[in-house]
C-alpha cells in the first residue's frame, strides 16, 4: 500500500485533508486498487491534476506533466526531460532547487525504486536525483523554521544518489 501524503504537493495536501474522511478514503482506495506500483504512481499524479484543476493551483501542473513523461520515458527524450524537470523545480546553472517540491523528489525516489535498474527511466531519474544531491535547496519565500527540517529530509532522500555511494 502506497502512503500518498509524501507524494502530494503542499497545496494539494492542504486541500486533500479538508475533504471528508469518506472522500479521502475513496482517493486512497482508487490509488491502491492498482496492482502495479507504476499505475499507482500514475493515479497519484491524476489525483493531483484533478486537485490543481478544481482549486486552480499554479505551477504544479507543469511538474506533474513532467513526472508523467518521466514514467513513460523513451530513449530520445531522456536528457531533455531531465533538464526540463530540473528547470521546473530549480535552476541547473545556479545549482539550486526549491524545497516546496520535496513531494516531486519523493515521487522520483519512489519511481526509481520501482524501475528496472538499467532502464532508461532509472538512468534518467538517477541523474536528476544525483544532481539534486549536490544542489542547494532554497525557499521560494522567506525562510522559516520548517524549511530547515525539510532541507534535512530532502538530503536524506537524496543521499543514496550521491556519487560516494
Identify what each model region corresponds to.
Residues 1-61:
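Charge-dense, helix-prone N-terminal extensions
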Residues 59, 133-165:
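Long, helix-rich interaction regions
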Residues 59-79:
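N-terminal "cap/leader" segments of large eukaryotic alpha-helical scaffolds
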Residues 62-67, 85-96, 137-142, 152-155:
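Boundary/linker elements of alpha-helical solenoid repeat scaffolds
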Residues 66-73, 110-112, 157-161:
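Alpha-solenoid HEAT/Armadillo-like helical repeat scaffolds in large eukaryotic proteins
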Residues 75-89:
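HEAT-repeat alpha-solenoid elements in large eukaryotic scaffold proteins
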Residues 81-85, 121-125, 154, 165:
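Conserved hydrophobic register position within alpha-solenoid helical repeats
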Residues 88-92, 111, 131-135, 161:
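Residue-level signature of the C-terminal ends
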Amino acid at each position: 500500500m502506497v502512503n500518498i501524503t509524501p507524494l502530494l504537493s503542499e497545496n494539494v495536501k492542504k486541500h486533500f485533508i479538508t475533504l471528508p474522511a469518506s472522500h479521502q478514503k475513496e482517493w486512497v482506495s482508487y490509488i491502491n486498487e492498482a496492482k502495479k506500483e507504476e499505475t499507482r504512481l500514475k493515479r497519484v499524479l491524476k489525483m493531483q491534476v484533478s486537485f490543481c484543476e478544481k482549486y486552480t493551483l499554479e505551477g504544479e501542473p507543469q511538474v506533474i506533466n513532467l513526472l508523467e513523461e518521466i514514467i513513460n520515458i523513451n530513449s530520445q527524450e531522456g536528457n531533455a526531460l531531465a533538464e526540463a524537470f530540473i528547470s521546473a523545480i530549480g535552476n541547473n546553472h545556479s545549482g539550486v532547487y526549491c524545497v516546496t517540491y520535496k513531494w516531486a523528489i519523493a515521487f522520483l525516489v519512489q519511481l526509481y525504486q520501482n524501475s528496472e535498474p538499467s532502464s532508461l527511466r532509472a538512468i534518467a531519474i538517477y541523474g536528476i536525483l544525483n544532481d539534486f544531491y549536490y544542489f542547494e535547496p532554497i525557499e521560494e519565500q522567506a525562510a522559516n523554521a520548517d524549511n530547515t527540517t525539510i532541507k534535512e529530509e530532502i538530503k536524506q532522500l537524496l543521499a543514496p544518489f550521491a556519487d560516494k555511494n
